[in-house]
Structures are given as C-alpha cells and as structure tokens.
Amino acid sequence: MNKSIVFSGAQPTGKLTIGNYIGSIRHWVEMQKHYQCIYCIVDLHSITVRNNLCSLHTRSLDTLALYLACGINPDISTIFIQSHVPEHSQLNWILNCYTYYGELNRMVQFKEKSSRYKNNINVGLFNYPILMASDILLYQTDFVPVGEDQRQHVELVRDIARRFNNIFGTVFKIPNVLISMYGSRIMSLLNPTRKMSKSDPDPNSYITLLDNVDCISKKIQGAVTDSDSPAAICFDPIKKPGISNLLAILSGISGQSILNLEESFQSKTYAQLKDVVIQELSCMLKDLQCRYISERSNEGKLNHILNVGSQKARMQAQITFKKVNELMGFYKES
C-alpha cells in the first residue's frame, strides 16, 4: 500500500536553532517511518530577504549536512533544492493568477515581516504563500507538518487548490496540516512571548545546533524565568512563559512528557531546572555536532544526495505540472 506523502521545507540558512530541531526536524525524522517524505531546501524562498547570495551555495550544503546529522535519511526520503526543480517557479506563476490580492494581504506573517524589513518590502515577500502552495501541491501532498504560525499559509494553499479544482476538475490533492501538541513553537530565551528565531538581532535569544557547551550554558543561564518564591515549575504558557519554554525544550530533547517533567521538578528550583536543560542540551548537541562535521566534510556525498533528490522530485513534479499545462491550454512544443 502506498504511503501518504509529507512535504516540508526550510530555508538554507546553514544555521538551525533548537527551535527548528524540536519544532520540525525531530518530527521529520520520525515521519520517515510512516510516510513518503519529501524535504525541500527552499532557496527561492530565502531570497525574499536580503542575505549574502554569494554564500547561498555553501549554506545549502551546511543545511543538508545538518539534516543528515539530525537523522534525515536520503535513502528513504527525497531531499532536494527548490531551485533545481523549475516546476516550482512555473506553477507559482499559474497559481498567482488564481489567488486574490485580498487573500495575500490578510497573511499575518507578511505583516510581521514587512514591519521588520521596512527597507525591503518586495513582491516576493508578499507572494511567498503562493510559492509555498506550488511547493506543496506539485507533489500531491497529503500532510504538511508546520507550526501554528504557518497554519494560515496552509489554509490558503487549501483554498487555492479547491478553487483550481472547482474550475478544472480534480488536479490537486487538498493537503492537511500536521501540528505537534508540544514543541511546535519554541520561544525566545529572552522574550518567551515571541518565537525563537535565528534572525533575532540578539544571539542570546536562541541556541543553534552548532553552539558549544559554554555558549549553551551562558544562554540558558540568562533565559527569562519568574521572580516568584518559592519556585513553581509548571507548564503554563500564559502565566509562566519562560518556565514553560524551558520545559518544552527539555521535553523536546529528552523525550519525556511535560507532565512527567512537572512532577520531577515539583520541589526543585529554577536554577536546578536550568542545570538539567544545559546538561541534556550539551550532551545531545555534542553528538549531533560530531555527525555534522563528518557529513559536511564529504562534499561529494552531499552533492550526490542533492542530485539524486532533485531527479526524484522532478519526476514527481512533472506529472502534476504536465496535467496543469494541458488543462490551461498552453501551446505544446512540437
């Protein structure tokens, strides 16, 4: 029996946080056992923000090496670079013509990013969700694992797919959202009401997968907690966002449930909680970093994985895009 298809992607920053790992990548690893997984390094999405384009190639390989170090297996999952499959961009233009301005204008993430990047509010940033729709719909995706902050984008993808299907018949599968109960949204260490982000101007607000032990210790020790006495270690994101964030991090890396952690820290201090988080994080990341160094040093292997992945992805993408092209009535090359 054919497995359901999961599609997910991340930008090639070359720098993933523990938020990326706990909220996304550890779930990607587990999903490989149950789904046909397609994981895309979305380099086209990444140019909506002004980064150093000269390093995009290097960052793409860094990101792949991190995926492998985390446990993504190219023998059972398809891993590829978005720009290597031109059907993404081609379908993007077609779906542009079946998406309304008002729909994009309601996207919360566009409003947040345009306020953050006031000198670069480009059309690509505005159209970002349509390219995301192309990414997902090309592969007849069943499930899209996303954080709560991306749910609105996937709902738009579903709306676009339904609209296209209503006009042309069933072309696209309507994807569903997969959201984990805990760990989908790891928050900033310094402002636990905001999502942890590697683009945060203060590096003490996040921990990357390549941070060393001293760096991890410093950042966790400086993480926001509470001033109540005696300490009350419980999961309550509204009343105790800092403590809840540390519990979510510890749960994500240790595999223990939030409930079990609450019980084990019932009579402990905030300092003791931080010490355990530091110990668990340092141990996990030390092993991961050793695997990363090994993978990143073999550039030939990385290139081979991407070449094979792109070929597999394009074969699937072309099936969908050919059907779309025929329905649109485009003149065929003779």
UniProtKB/Swiss-Prot annotation:
Catalytically driven reaction(s): tRNA(Trp) + L-tryptophan + ATP = L-tryptophyl-tRNA(Trp) + AMP + diphosphate + H(+)
Keyword list, A-Z: Aminoacyl-tRNA synthetase, ATP-binding, Cytoplasm, Ligase, Nucleotide-binding, Protein biosynthesis
Residues bound to L-tryptophan: D135
Motif ('HIGH' region): 12-20
Any single Gene Ontology cellular-component annotation: cytosol
CDD domains per UniProt: TrpRS_core
The protein's Enzyme Commission number: 6.1.1.2
Localization terms from the record: Cytoplasm
Parts of the chain that traverse the membrane: none
Top enzyme category: ligase
GO biological process: tryptophanyl-tRNA aminoacylation
PROSITE patterns: AA_TRNA_LIGASE_I
Motif 'KMSKS' region, residue range(s) on this chain: 195-199
Pfam families documented for this protein: tRNA-synt_1b
Binding residue positions for ATP: Q11, P12, T13, G19, N20, G147, E148, D149, I186, K195, M196, S197, K198, S199
MF (Gene Ontology): ATP binding; tryptophan-tRNA ligase activity
The keyword rRNA-binding is assigned to this record: no
InterPro entries: aa-tRNA-synth_I_CS (IPR001412), aa-tRNA-synth_Ic (IPR002305), Rossmann-like_a/b/a_fold (IPR014729), Trp-tRNA-ligase (IPR002306), Trp-tRNA-ligase_bac-type (IPR024109), Trp-tRNA_synthetase (IPR050203)
Main location: cytoplasm
Family (UniProt): Belongs to the class-I aminoacyl-tRNA synthetase family.
NCBIfam families: trpS
Reported function: Catalyzes the attachment of tryptophan to tRNA(Trp).
Assembly mode: Homodimer.
Protein name (record): Tryptophan--tRNA ligase
The organism of origin for this protein: Blochmanniella floridana
Gene name of the encoded protein: trpS
